[in-house]
Amino acid sequence: MSLNKQFFKFVIPSIIAMWVFSIYTIVDGFFVANFAGELELSAVTIVVPYVNFLFAIAIITGVGSQTIIGIELGKGNRDEANKVFTFIILFILAFSVVLALLAIIFMNQIIRFLGADSTLFHLSHDYLSVIVFFSPFYIIAYAFEVLVKVDGFPRTAIIGAVSACVTNIILDYILIHKFQMGVRGAALATGIAQFLSCLIFFIHFRAAKGYLRFVKIKMSAKEVFHYLKKTVVYGFGEFISELNTATFVFIFNLFIIKYLSPEYLSAYAVINYMSLFASSTFQGVCHGTLPLLSYYHGSEERDKSIKIIRMSFIFVFIISVIMYAIAYFGAET
């Protein structure tokens, strides 16, 4: 397969998958705004930075381990790649459960820190309490989606993401519109969708269709530290990018609540959804090229890595121009 075909085989599914992950939040916002109310949408917006934080954790572990695994596969070290894969999934599972337990214990403090006032506190609590329960699936599903691409199955990433998205839309309609469950319904719909996504990806890896599969591992403390350190180093840039998004939304939320009123958060939510869609496109390009770059780095094919980077810059530039034109000429629409 030519390098151009490989590039688009991985990048296009990654962009679509990232769009789908963005749609989770947008769909929740749409149904909450139309069938619950403005205050409910504002409560969802308050919790968005926490959801971004969950994705940041998923990114640093998923992208970091994807790079390590890609390099090992490029070198032909399949056993080592499977060892890293199994270890990182077990680590994510344990870490995300601990994170969820801490969030449950400090739920009220987290909500106040996020900026919820007395008007939004209970609504934000209703939404976050459900999100926290499903948070391990948020992190694992995203990590699985990244790792299934380095396994050579970018289309499976789309299948998992789209299946979950469709489920989310259907459940949002049923739980928010039909059962009038408000923000709890929105959070429950998204949580179940993330669980479904996890299940689809788990079945793929359990079936051992590609290079990666779960194996029995025995690692020393030195090995654990070594792989965690490399994971953090490789995934840190993407982690900071996602954390910046969370910080940006968090600061805007605080200013709007302090100097305007909670109702204005619903208007900001719409703007945030549009910017989320744009940033997801660029993240999709990044995540799509990473498996190729790490593989060719491992196989020491530097010329191919350089060509992929060049194609990425050109592709991102073209997409940026198109998006700017749409935003400029279609702002009123």
Predicted regions and their residues:
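Signature of the first transmembrane helix
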Residues: 5-66, 233-257
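Residue-level recognition of transmembrane alpha-helices
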Residues: 11-14, 18, 45-48, 92, ...
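Small-residue-rich hydrophobic transmembrane alpha-helices
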Residues: 41-101, 138-157, 267-331
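Alpha-helical transmembrane segments of multi-pass membrane proteins
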Residues: 118-141, 276
